[in-house]
Amino acid sequence: MGTNKPVVIGIAGGSGSGKTSVTKAIFDHFKGHSILILEQDYYYKDQSHLPMEERLKTNYDHPLAFDNDLLIDHLQQLLAYEQVEKPIYDYTLHTRSEKIIPVEPKDVIILEGILILEDPRLCELMDIKVFVDTDADLRILRRMQRDIEERGRTMDSVIDQYVNVVRPMHNQFIEPSKKFADIIIPEGGQNHVAIDIMVTKIATILEQKVNL
């Protein structure tokens, strides 16, 4: 375990942009090192106090849907090399699960989420801020596949949500947050050149911290 503060890489972008692919590529490159992934998706607000009809109205693409206070608290604890208990979100019940995931601190933290660059408090904790930029048509196709296969949604509900929620929220909150990125990666996880540049930059930062 390092004696210095861990390196935090923030990876943002629209739903279906390829954030997970970029995150996995970086994680796989450094998997022999001390590295972890912290997903903003796990930090949706607990809604157990609300009836199901109210939970179903949740706008998961709005900044207020996230419990960023808890996410920031956990990130600060990990930066202090303290263990945290990451929440699990149940998308079928539309609320936080009673289960948790213990997360041990690591020297490299990849923070991934659609709106992590929208919150200045999170940006302040990042060493590298990345925005994965992908064509809207490709993003909706990826989101449809994920929500149908992994979250039990119907195609009609996914399309309706995209038109009425996802697209306007992307234009209002996610796209504007791109200006806070240090690096913008077009073509998502297929852009191997950009990923290689990121890997080199991360390795340089890690080496500098070791030599401090």
From Swiss-Prot:
Swiss-Prot/TrEMBL catalytic activity: uridine + ATP = UMP + ADP + H(+); cytidine + ATP = CMP + ADP + H(+)
CDD domains in UniProt: UMPK
Pfam families reported for this sequence: PRK
Cellular component per GO, a single term: cytoplasm
Binding sites annotated in the UniProt record for ATP: G13, G14, S15, G16, S17, G18, K19, T20
Gene Ontology terms describing biological process: CTP salvage; UMP salvage
Molecular function via GO: ATP binding; cytidine kinase activity; uridine kinase activity
HAMAP family: Uridine_kinase
Gene3D superfamilies, sorted: P-loop containing nucleotide triphosphate hydrolases (3.40.50.300)
Enzyme class: transferase
Location relative to the cell: Cytoplasm
Recorded metabolic or biological pathway in which this protein acts: Pyrimidine metabolism; CTP biosynthesis via salvage pathway; CTP from cytidine: step 1/3; Pyrimidine metabolism; UMP biosynthesis via salvage pathway; UMP from uridine: step 1/1
EC number: 2.7.1.48
Protein name: Uridine kinase
Family that this chain belongs to: Belongs to the uridine kinase family.
SUPFAM superfamilies: P-loop containing nucleoside triphosphate hydrolases (SSF52540)
Signal sequence coordinates: none
